[in-house]
UniProtKB/Swiss-Prot annotation:
PROSITE patterns in alphabetical order: G_ENGA (PS51712)
Molecular-function annotations in GO: GTP binding; ribosome binding
Disulphide-bridged cysteine pairs: none
Residue intervals of the EngA-type G domain: 4-167, 176-351
Quaternary state and interactors: Associates with the 50S ribosomal subunit.
Protein name: GTPase Der
SUPFAM superfamilies per record: P-loop containing nucleoside triphosphate hydrolases (SSF52540)
Single biological process term from Gene Ontology: ribosome biogenesis
Binding site residues for GTP 1: 10-17, 57-61, 119-122
Residue ranges of domain KH-like in the record: 352-436
Primary role: GTPase that plays an essential role in the late steps of ribosome biogenesis.
Organism: Macrococcus caseolyticus (strain JCSC5402) (Macrococcoides caseolyticum)
Upper classification of the organism: Bacteria, Bacillati, Bacillota, Bacilli, Bacillales
This protein's record includes keyword GTP-binding: yes
Length: 436
């Protein structure tokens, strides 16, 4: 099931990022102590009452010296392309400016619902100032104060009225859904075409020519798969040409629907920061992951080339040390037979459950090998461990003091669980809870 998406749009200095941070709260920072994952604050998840949604802060756009109208056009374009609902932000202290009118005209051209938020209404006396904003043509303006957190609930109530109905996907549980993510032109569509052996999507050397995400059902050795293709950036307008950071937006909806994510990188161009950022979203979403090095045919090779490249991948993707690596050439259709065994393994491990009795034996042995940490004369005690979820496998440790379960010791326990049970291809979530 795909969560609805809200985009916050408006001219500069109306408080878009403040409202974004109010809505997402502490959810923005998820894996601060995980090396290699840089957190991009322009896209996050939010919750309001019974609703879960994704939210885009278009204030994060950085187009350098581009004229104002180009920046706003870029913001509106992202919102119109990616969002189910648009929150149009204006500044209640300034009244309607020419720039607000420009944004309004752009949003009128879209068929997306627009909710008008009038920010910086910091006290009840200022509410009289909002009525002029009716003239923008988007119905009732909602007075809000980002700095004081006022009116956000009413704004989200209105936005939620426009969320599309959520439909459960009609694929069987044993079907493996996987997506291919990566920056533009690493060969995602070419990989799907090579696997299927037919031209089911548009393939072009120009980034962004795949029209929409395309689900393709495919059977291989009696296992049914659903492949979700996402093209990274669409070639529509300035922002998609000006910055690659928005390629993550195209990937995120596909990640959400997947069991297994193939992180595709370009052997010829090597690994760049954008690759790590996109992979980080799949990791944070708790999906099973296979790293696919495409265009392997373009690399001059000797007996050590693959090992050297694998070492480079491990160095750059330290947070994906559990993910297997496949080296393929979509163009030459070589080594593609290595993909499905890895997808199957990652998918199976993502759903794997282990017996509590065996798990606790492993943890007991681990503690005997490396005793738990101490603090001010007190030692961390792990009373009991149990697996509480799959996709990804999630383990709860009942302890005497949650604060003493340091990241480094948690990492050690994760490694011992992996050594005992495998779990290659899937992240593991470890949670410490105080025993009552």
């Amino acid at each position: 099931m795909t969560k609805p998406t809200i985009a916050i749009v408006g001219r500069a200095n109306v408080g878009k990022s403040t409202i974004f941070n109010r809505i997402v709260g502490e959810r923005v920072s998820i894996v601060e102590d995980t090396p290699g994952v840089t957190r991009d604050r322009i896209y996050s998840s939010g919750e309001w009452l019974t609703h879960e949604f994704n939210i885009i802060d278009t204030g994060g756009i950085e187009l350098g010296d581009e004229p104002f109208q180009e920046q706003i056009r870029a913001q509106a374009e992202i919102a119109i392309e990616e969002a189910d609902v648009i929150i149009f932000m204006v500044n209640g202290r300034d009244g309607i400016t020419n720039e607000d009118d420009f944004v309004a005209k752009l949003l009128f051209k879209s068929s997306k619902p627009v909710v008008l938020g009038v920010n910086k209404i910091d006290n009840p006396e200022m509410r009289a100032d909002i009525y002029e904003f009716y003239s923008l043509g988007f119905g009732e303006p909602f007075p809000i104060s980002g700095s004081h957190g006022l009116g956000i609930g009413d704004l989200l109530d209105e936005a939620a009225k426009h969320f599309p109905e959520q439909q459960e996907e009609d694929y069987d549980d044993d079907v493996i859904k996987f997506s291919l993510i990566g920056r533009p032109n690493v060969g995602k569509s070419s990989l799907i075409n090579a696997i299927l052996g037919e031209e089911r999507v548009i393939v072009s050397p120009v980034a962004g020519t795949t029209r929409d995400a395309i689900d393709t059902v495919y059977t291989f050795e009696n296992q049914e798969y659903v492949m979700i293709d996402t093209a990274g950036m669409r070639k529509k307008g300035k922002v998609y040409e000006a910055t690659e950071r928005y390629s993550v937006l195209r990937a995120l909806k596909a990640i959400e629907r997947s069991n297994v994510v193939l992180v595709v990188i370009d052997a010829e161009e090597g690994i760049i920061e954008q690759d790590k950022k996109i992979a980080g979203y799949a990791h944070e979403a708790g999906k099973a992951i296979v790293i696919v090095v495409n265009k392997w045919d373009t690399v001059e090779k000797d007996s050590k080339t693959m090992k050297k490249f694998e070492d480079k991948v491990r160095e750059n993707f330290q947070f994906l040390d559990y993910a297997p690596i496949a080296f393929v050439s979509a163009k030459e259709r070589k080594r593609l037979n290595t993909l499905f065994p890895l997808i199957n393994m990652a998918g199976e491990n993502h759903r794997k459950r282990v017996q509590s009795s065996t798990l606790n034996e492993v943890i007991t042995d681990a503690v005997a090998m490396n005793p738990t940490p101490t603090h001010k004369g007190s030692r961390l005690n792990i009373f009991y461990t149990t697996q509480v979820a799959i996709e990804p496998p999630t383990f709860v440790f009942f302890v005497n003091d949650v604060e003493m379960m340091h990241f480094s010791y948690q990492r050690f326990l994760e490694n011992r669980i992996r050594a005992a049970f495998g779990f290659e291809g899937t992240p593991l979530h470890l949670i410490a809870r105080k025993r009552n």
